[in-house]
Amino acid sequence: MATYKVTLISEEHDINTTIDCNDDVFVLDAAEEAGIDLPYSCRAGACSTCAGKVTEGTIDQSEQTFLDDDQMGAGFVLTCIAYPKSDCTILVHQEDELY
């Protein structure tokens, strides 16, 4: 099991925090454990409430069913089903940016 540094950023919500996240823990769950309040709804990768955008690093979100190829290609990720695969930076609170 690897542990990665995940940096979560939202200027609008005054978030700029780096957390430790194991490669078998969803980013949303690790953020909650660290006391960071991120938006979520379904927790199953089937909506866009928890959307973020990866600006650096690699994420495994193979369990998601909502985002299309273009959105994923642009770096969008659903934090509720996203596992880190490297140290990474994620802009959070990005649901409005999807559309």
Curated annotation (Swiss-Prot):
Alphabetic keyword roster: 2Fe-2S, Chloroplast, Electron transport, Iron, Iron-sulfur, Metal-binding, Plastid, Transport
SUPFAM superfamilies: 2Fe-2S ferredoxin-like (SSF54292)
Alphabetized Gene3D superfamilies for the sequence: 3.10.20.30
Iron found in the keyword field: yes
Keyword Ribosomal protein (UniProt): no
Swiss-Prot/TrEMBL GO biological process terms: electron transport chain
Domain 2Fe-2S ferredoxin-type: residue ranges: 4-96
Protein purpose: Ferredoxins are iron-sulfur proteins that transfer electrons in a wide variety of metabolic reactions.
Name of the protein this chain belongs to: Ferredoxin
Source species of the chain: Thalassiosira weissflogii (Marine diatom)
